[in-house]
Amino acid sequence: MRIGIFTRLGADSIMRFFCTREKKTLSNNLSPIGGPAVNTLIVGFLAKGHFVRVFTPATNDFYVKGDGVEVVGLKNNDNYLVKYTVGCFVDAFRMKRAIENKIHDLDVLHAHWSYEGAWAAGQYAHIKPVFCTIRDWAPLIWKFESAKNKITWSFRVLLNELVLRQKKVEFVANSPYTANLAKRKLKKEVPMIPNPISPSFLKSDSHVNPLIFTVLCISSSNDKRKNIPTLLKGFQFFFKKNNNARLQIIGEPFTLDNECCKAWEAQGLLKSVELLGLQKHDDLKCFLDNCSVFITPSLEETFGNTLIEAFARRVPVIGGEKSGAVPYVLGQGEFGYLCDVSDAQSVAAALYEVYSNPSESLLIAEKAYMNVETRYVSNRICDEHIELYNKAIGSYEN
């Protein structure tokens, strides 16, 4: 099958399919990580012999061709005022024009996230099947954002609304939580296909806890929804009673020169905390293998890809009991520990639960690993997508 994917592509994930010159173009114009779940899906399609053409935001316009895959980079508007106001609309219209002559040889178009790529792809839903996987819920994100960021997100909420009104686009949810939100909005059932994980992420041997009780958090941002300050406070409560412990936080904002991090340090919230900044996605395996527990303090997630990555490395996991799709991924507590992540004392209590019951926590982690192995491995998730595509193609042909 010939598949068009709209996503923010991570360069590192597909380097193996390109020659040296093309690799340089990719590394110069794309972020190294992008969206790991969609990266994994793309690689899974390629492994099964499908052709994939990826349309992605980039530093500059470019086109590269590799082994069974092509990447079309589309430069975003970088004017400051435009970028943080109507930029999403400008980019959507530009993408629509740019892809016009690059989609006719494709069997299906699939946009991930319901913004620029989804709107652009949706303009061609009258000639071929177009799918959109809803990977966040824009109105809810708007509520969490600061007053300044609400300006930007007001435009994104409007664009998301226009995408969801496209009658010919077939929507997909990445969790029952997202599917329920979409059902209420669209007044119809929406199929659910969860995020995939690469088989290479699965750890074959058992997890061994480090000598120092190590708490690991991976977060792509430092906004209110990600709730990092509550984690820091909860860890400090835990650390006062169990000083053989450390907290490691991975993600681009988490460096000592970041203004928020400086403020946390001044408040005494960084005692025994290591800010590790952005790390290569493949290197996360090493950090997971050397931690005692993984925690996501997010107040809301439509899935939470880092949760299944921790499962895949056989690591105990803590997440929020009311945090969107997190309880679903954690099997309502069967595959991990649920707590009130909005309360620092509850976070500390969950950390203590794992700390004081290492054997039990590793048994729960083993159950989580088995669940990942049977439900989330990319081979299965790719097949579920292809089945969905084939049904849509058949209806268009008929």
Where do the protein language model's features map onto the residues?
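Glycosyltransferase donor-sugar binding loop
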Residues: I218-S219, R246-C261, G277
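Conserved donor-binding/catalytic core segment of Leloir-type glycosyltransferases
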Residues: H207-K226, L232-Q236, Q248
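Short hydrophobic beta-strand element within catalytic cores of glycosyltransferases
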Residues: P316-G320
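Conserved acidic donor-binding segment of nucleotide-sugar-dependent glycosyltransferases
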Residues: Q332-A344, E353-P358
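Nucleotide-activated donor-binding/catalytic signature segment of Leloir-type glycosyltransferases, i.e.
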Residues: C260-Q279
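Aromatic "clamp/platform" in nucleotide-sugar-dependent glycosyltransferases that forms part
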Residues: L299
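Membrane-proximal helix-turn-helix segments that form the acceptor-binding/catalytic region
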Residues: N39-L41, A138, I151-F171
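Carbohydrate-associated surface elements
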Residues: Y177, P196
